[in-house]
């Protein structure tokens, strides 16, 4: 059986992180080795703590380590608009733009038949439940849904599906403008472009 050294194992695990290639993983591993014991211990503690304490917000499905996330808890935000995103990291990009002061809903992905991801694998039913709770008076009344999904095939497929599901519910339904380049990931769009894309959103 081929022996894998502790260093090789660390490089392998680091290279599995998104955006981290083998060379970057190797540099990170050597940095960790050079720092002595204190930093690796703090890093290990932070990783274990985030896995133990962070969970989905029961309302919007953003990550939080409290009962509900800061955006759902903030009484100064508008209940009338919900911005739908694919991933929790997309919220940080939108918040940095300063162009949105409503609520959020995280789908945790996008429809991708090739990867076996359909509507049931996403938080789509929960979004529709929020809308219907508003219509019945058991939840905040929602007037607008803004779809801030990635500008790729999966994002477009998800937008078409959501538009069909939300038809006839008296909502203003819009998607962010094409200031976001085709094929781009929301998480890599700069603040100014994201702000313009939200302000110039297109009604569906």
From Swiss-Prot:
Superkingdom of origin organism: Bacteria
GO biological process: DNA recombination; DNA repair
Zn finger residue spans: C4-type: 57-72
InterPro entries: DNA_Rcmb_RecR, Rcmb_RecR, Rcmb_RecR_Znf, TOPRIM_dom, TOPRIM_RecR
Domain Toprim residue range list: 80-181
Coiled-coil region list: none
Any Pfam family hit: RecR_HhH
CDD domains registered for this protein in UniProt: TOPRIM_recR (cd01025)
Keywords: DNA damage, DNA recombination, DNA repair, Metal-binding, Zinc, Zinc-finger
PROSITE patterns: TOPRIM
Molecular function GO terms recorded: DNA binding; zinc ion binding
Family of this protein: Belongs to the RecR family.
Entries under HAMAP family matching the protein: RecR (MF_00017)
Entry function: May play a role in DNA repair. It seems to be involved in an RecBC-independent recombinational process of DNA repair. It may act with RecF and RecO.
PANTHER family according to UniProt: RECOMBINATION PROTEIN RECR
Protein known as: Recombination protein RecR
């Amino acid at each position: 059986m081929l022996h894998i050294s502790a260093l090789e194992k660390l490089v392998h695990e680091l290279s599995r992180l998104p955006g981290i290639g083998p060379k970057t993983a190797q540099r990170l591993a050597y940095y960790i080795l050079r720092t002595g014991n204190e930093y690796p211990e703090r890093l290990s503690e932070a990783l274990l703590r985030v896995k133990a304490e962070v969970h989905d917000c029961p309302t919007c499905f953003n990550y939080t380590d409290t009962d509900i996330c800061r955006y759902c808890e903030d009484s100064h935000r508008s209940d009338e608009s919900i911005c739908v995103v694919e991933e929790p990291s997309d919220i940080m990009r939108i918040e940095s733009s300063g162009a949105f002061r409503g609520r959020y809903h995280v789908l945790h992905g996008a429809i991708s038949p090739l990867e076996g991801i359909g509507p049931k694998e996403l938080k789509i039913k929960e979004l529709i439940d929020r809308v219907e709770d508003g219509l019945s008076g058991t939840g905040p009344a929602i007037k607008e849904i803004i779809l801030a999904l990635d500008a790729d095939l999966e994002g477009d497929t998800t937008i078409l599906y959501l538009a069909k599901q939300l038809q006839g519910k008296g909502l203003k339904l819009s998607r962010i403008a094409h200031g976001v380049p085709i094929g781009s990931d929301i998480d890599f769009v700069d603040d100014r472009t994201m702000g313009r894309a939200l302000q110039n959103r297109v009604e569906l």
